[in-house]
From Swiss-Prot:
Disulfide bonds: none annotated. The gene is adat2. It comes from Xenopus laevis. GO terms for biological process: tRNA wobble adenosine to inosine editing. Keywords: Hydrolase, Metal-binding, tRNA processing, Zinc. Probably participates in deamination of adenosine-34 to inosine in many tRNAs. It catalyses: adenosine(34) in tRNA + H2O + H(+) = inosine(34) in tRNA + NH4(+). Transmembrane segments: none annotated. HAMAP family: tRNA_aden_deaminase. This is tRNA-specific adenosine deaminase 2. The active site is at 61 (proton donor).
Amino acid sequence: MEPLQITEEIQNWMHKAFQMAQDALNNGEVPVGCLMVYGNQVVGKGRNEVNETKNATQHAEMVAIDQVLDWCEMNSKKSTDVFENIVLYVTVEPCIMCAGALRLLKIPLVVYGCRNERFGGCGSVLNVSGDDIPDTGTKFKCIGGYQAEKAIELLKTFYKQENPNAPKSKVRKKE
C-alpha cells in the first residue's frame, strides 16, 4: 500500500463514498460505500446490500461492478476498456473476494479508507492486489488511509447495534 497524497479530487470522491457508507448503515448494512470513476464521471456506485438481498456477495464493490456493466451497455462502451481505466474509491479495504474481482477486471487503482484486518485483499490479510498469482488478472495499486478513523467509527457503530438479520444462535445451554 502506498501513502496517500490527498488531493481535492480524492476528497470529493471519498466524501461521496462515505455518504454511500452512511446510507448502508442507515439501512442496517455493514457501512461500506464505493464509487467507480471513469473519465471523471461516476459510472458505478454501491453500498453493502448483503442483508437486504440475503446475498452474501452483494458487497459495495460488486454492486458497483454491476452498475458499470449496465452503464457500458447503455453507452455502447466495451466494458473491458472501461474497467481498465476506472479508479475505485471505497471506504474500507476491499475484501479478498472483491479484490479478486477487481484484479480480474483489471481495475488499475483503488483508494480506500481503513484497512480490513479480517478479510482485506490489499495486504491486510492477503495481497491479492499485488502478489504474483498466475492466470488471475492484473495487479492493481492500492492507496489506503483516507479518513481511516471515520471509516472505523462507522464500522464500530454498526457492530455495536443489534443485527436483526443475524442467524439465531445454535449454541445449546447445558441443563
